[in-house]
Amino acid sequence: MNITIKSSRTVDGNIAAPPSKSMAHRAVLCAALAKGTSHLHHLAFSKDISATLGAAARLCARVTTGENDAVVEGLGRFLPVDAPVDCCESGSTLRFLIPLASLTGQEVTFTGRGRLMERPQSVYKTLYQQQGLRFEQGADRLTVEGALTPGEYELAGNVSSQFISGLLFALPLLGGTSTLHLIPPVESRSYIDMTRAVQHAFGVESRWLDENTLEIPGGQHYLPGDYTVEGDYSQAAFPAVLGAVTGGVAITGLSEETLQGDAAILEILRRCGARFTRTGQGVVFEKAPLHGTDIDLADCPDLGPVLMVLGLLCEGTTVIRNAERLRIKESDRIEAMETELRACGGQLESEGGTITIHGCAGALHAPEQPLSGHNDHRVVMSLAVLALATGLALPISGAEAIAKSWPDFLEAIKPLGAEVEHVG
C-alpha cells in the first residue's frame, strides 16, 4: 500500500490509545493454558495478536473472537501438532511459544514470515543444547523436540526479555521449582514484571529472590478468568511525540498505574521540554519549545524510531544510547530510519547502538522519491508523525506494515488533521 500523508489543517484533536499488544499476547497465552473459559476484553486484532490467538488454538485452546474481545476456552491439555505453527512475523509469539512447545511431548515446528526466522534465537538454542533437547533453526522454520526439566537456568539479562518471559510461561507447569539466574545488567525488566503480573491475574506466581534471580514454583495451574487489556504506551508514543511538537493533541485510554516500560515516553518528552497534563486515563499536550536530550533505550527499544523523528524536531542534539536491538527487529530500524530521514534532509549518524541526531526542523523537505516503510510498522508510523509534525507531504511505500500492530492507525490519526491519499 502506497500512501501520501500530510496535515490538512493545524494538528489538534483526540486519539484513543489502542489496546496494549504486549499485554494482549500474555493474556491470550495465560487464558489458553488455563483449563476453562476466559473472557479477554479490549483487544485489537493486529497481525501479531491474531498470530498468538491462532497458535493458541493450534496448541491447547478453542478461541472465539468478537469485535474487540475474545473467549478463550483452555482445554487443559495439548493438542496433536501435525502441521507447522505459523507465527507470521511476531517475535513475541515465537519466543513465548518455544518453551511451551517443549511441554507437549511432541516435535513442534514453527514457521514465520519477513525477517522473523532471521531474528536471533541463540538463547534458546544454547539452553536446549545444554539439556540435550532438539533445536533446529532453518531459513524458514524452527523445530523443537524434547521436554524441559525443572531446575537452574542461567540467561543473560541484556537479551530480549521475550526469552525470559517464554520460560516464565512454561516453568510453572513443570513438576518442580525452577530458578532463573539473570546475568546483569537486566534490561527490559518492566516486560518481565508485566509477564508476572498477567500470570498473577491467572493464578500463577513467581518471585524475585534478588534483583537478578527469579524463583518459579512448579506444579502450578493457570486459572481461567476475565481480563481487560490496558491502552498501549508503545503505540501512544506516536501521537505523544506529535503532540509534544505541535500541541493540541489529547490521548485517551492510558493508565497511570502501568508496568509498561514504554510509558517512559512521557518522561523522555518531559526532559525535552514537552508540556502536558495527565487527566485520569489520558494525556493532553500543549505546544512548547523542545530541546535535545540523552536517551537510554535499554528498557524501551520500541520507542527508538519515533524518538529519532523527535530528535530532528528538537533544538540541539539528541543522543540515543543502548539501541543495538533496533538492528534485529522487523527491519534494521537504525539503518531504515537513517535512510528515510536523510532523504528528508535529516542530519543524524550512528555507531553501533548509539545514534546522534541533530535538530534541523527548518532544513527538512519532501523527499525526491517515495520513502520506504521497510516492511516495519514502527518505521511507517514514525514517518507519518514526521509528515504531520512538519506539514510536509510525505509519500510512503509499504504502509500496509502497520497491520502488524495498529491496523487502524491511518484512520485514527485523521481526527488529528491527517490527510491520507492512497496512491496506485
Residue ranges and their predicted role:
Residues M1-G424:
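Short, structured segments at the rim of ligand-binding sites
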